[in-house]
C-alpha cells in the first residue's frame, strides 16, 4: 500500500519534475536544495550569517541569498551547487529580488530604510534607493520596470522606477506588511500584513490599495496560483486560501509549525511552504487544496522570496 501511495504521489508531482527548491535555513546556516520530482533533498550548501532571503534568477543560473548577521549577499551557482561570490551590503539585508533579465539584484536593508542595487555581473553594490522604514519583502514586475518594497514599520509599499531608481509612489496598506508578491500580468500586488492579519491588494498602475482580505494570525508571505491567493499564517500553522477575483476566503490548509516562505511552481499546480519550527517543506496541491507531501530540510527554514528554480 505504501509503495502504491508513493507512486501516486510521485506521479502527481510529475508536472514539477523540472523544478527545485532552494530553501534558506537560518539556524543551520545553510541552503537545502530539494528536487521536487523525487521530494528529496539533493544538496546542502553552507552559507553562514543566518541566511533568510533568497531569489533565484529567471534563467536558473544563480541563487542569491541574504545573510542579515553577515551583512552580505551570497551568490550561488545553482546548477553547480557551489558559492561563487559574496557581496558586502552592510546594514541588515533581508528581502531580495532579481530583475527579470538577471542584470540587477535588489536587496532590502532592514536597518537603513533602503534598497541596495547590486550589479549581478560585477557582484558589487552600484546604487542605493531610499524607501520606508524596515523594508522586508521585494518584488519586481514581470517587465522589470518597477520594484515594490514592503516597508514594514511605515505600513506602506514603495513603488520604484528601476530605470531612474526614483520613487514612483507610496501605497498605504495594512499594519506591518512583510511579504509582497506581484501577479503574472504585473497589474496587482499583494502584501501580507503581519499587524492586521490581512492581505492588501494593490493596483500597481495607480499605486493605490483596492482591497483587503482577512486571513489568519501573523501572515508572512503570499503565493498566487489558479486564480487564488495562498498566504502563510505563521501563528496558526496554516495557509489561508482566497479567491483573487472576489477576494473571498476559500479554505485554510494545515501545514507545519510557523510557516513562512511560500511560492507556486511555474505551472501553478503546486504550492511550496517552508515551515520554520517543523524544519520541513510542505507541498500543497493547488487544485485539490490539500497537502500532498512533506520534505525534511535544515534547521529554521525561511525561504523568504522566489526560491524555486526551473531546471529545464
Name each model-derived stretch.
Residues 12-312:
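Predominantly soluble domains enriched in secretory-pathway, periplasmic, or organellar proteins
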Residues 3-12:
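Bacterial N-terminal signal peptides
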